[in-house]
């Protein structure tokens, strides 16, 4: 599923996005953010992060630099290392 989503995003970036004027208010662009989020966090969480990001893309949000959050270590979530 992850590879299919990545292919769809790449298709969008290469063939669909160039047909419209660039007007993304964020860096990286929403499609690049989605690609990075899926690669970093997997299909489910990456898609969730992408949806959250796209919902922020409106005229009342200032935009700017908004990187994909780094993946947390499993041990940093309160789990003991044995």
From Swiss-Prot:
Residues 61-82 are annotated as: Disordered. It is found in: Cell inner membrane. One of its GO terms (cellular component) is plasma membrane. The keyword Membrane applies. InterPro entries: Membr_insert_effic_factor_YidD. SMART domains: Haemolytic. The keyword Membrane applies. Could be involved in insertion of integral membrane proteins into the membrane. Belongs to the UPF0161 family. This is Putative membrane protein insertion efficiency factor. It comes from Fusobacterium nucleatum subsp. nucleatum (strain ATCC 25586 / DSM 15643 / BCRC 10681 / CIP 101130 / JCM 8532 / KCTC 2640 / LMG 13131 / VPI 4355).
């Amino acid at each position: 599923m992850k590879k299919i989503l990545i292919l769809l995003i790449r298709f969008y970036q290469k063939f669909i996005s160039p047909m419209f004027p660039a007007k993304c208010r964020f860096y990286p662009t929403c499609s690049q953010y989605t690609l990075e989020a899926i690669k970093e966090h997997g299909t489910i969480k990456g898609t969730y992060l992408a949806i959250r990001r796209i919902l922020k893309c409106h005229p009342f949000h200032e935009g700017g630099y908004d990187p994909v959050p780094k993946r947390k270590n499993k041990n940093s979530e309160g789990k003991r290392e044995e």
